[in-house]
Structures are given as structure tokens and as C-alpha cells.
Amino acid sequence: ADATEVRAPIDIAVTSLLATVQAALPDLRSKKGAVLVTNGGLGLLDSKVDAGAVQWKASGLALANAAKAKLVRLLNKQLEADGVFVGEVVVLGAVKGTAWDDGSSKLEASSIAARFWQLYNERRELSVHIG
């Protein structure tokens, strides 16, 4: 990956997430809120995932997803004393009916929504995988 391939995904996935959380902090703290993040499987530390990211020329996205996962954990640790929960749902695969669906996707958007709802209500696990 070269720097130009990495910069935009990092700005979108990491920098914008951090800026958004910072802007919402007063409300998050006062309401004991939650930040729920969608992430993708390309950020997983796995040699097969790495090979796929290289093959699909998605190294920037893979790096951004890995960095976003770390940011979720750091933010949760920083904000837990204030009663704010930060967690992520990692989607492993294409979602049925989306542009990425080649007709073989079985992952339903409603299943992802249910995982988010569970994550929000339980506030136990920082990262859950679906797909």
C-alpha cells in the first residue's frame, strides 16, 4: 500500500470517528450514551484476510478497519468511567441486497441490526462478529 491509498480510508474510518465522538461527548456523558461502530472483516489480523486485502487492492481499507478497531477499544477505555460505552459490530461478508451482494450473500441487514441492539443493551463485549 502506498500513502495515498491509506490516507483517505484512515481519515474516513478513524479521524472522522474520533471527531464525531469528541463533538458528541457532552451529550454522551450526560446521557450515559453509547457509540456503536460498524467495522469490516478486512481489519482482522489473519493471513487469509491479508491475502484477500492485497488481492482486492484494499490495503488502505484493511489498515483503516484495524485502526478503527483499536480506536473503539481505546475510546471505550477512556470513556467507561463516564458511563459511555463504545463497541463495534464487525461484518464478515457481503450483506444480502447490497451492491456487494453477488447473489450468494446470506447475511441479512436485520441480523446486523439485532447484533447492534444486543451490543447496546448488554454493553459487555466491545467487539462482536457477524457473518
Where are these regions (language model features)?
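Hydrophobic positions on the long internal alpha-helix
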Residues: 16, 20-24
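Short glycine-enriched, charge-decorated loop/helix-capping segments at active-site entrances
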Residues: 4, 57-58, 101-106
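C-terminal helical subdomain
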Residues: 66-131
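Catalytic loop of short-chain dehydrogenase/reductase
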Residues: 5-11, 19, 29, 34-73, ...
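Glycine/small-residue-rich loop that forms an oxyanion/phosphate-binding "nest" at active or ligand-binding sites
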Residues: 1
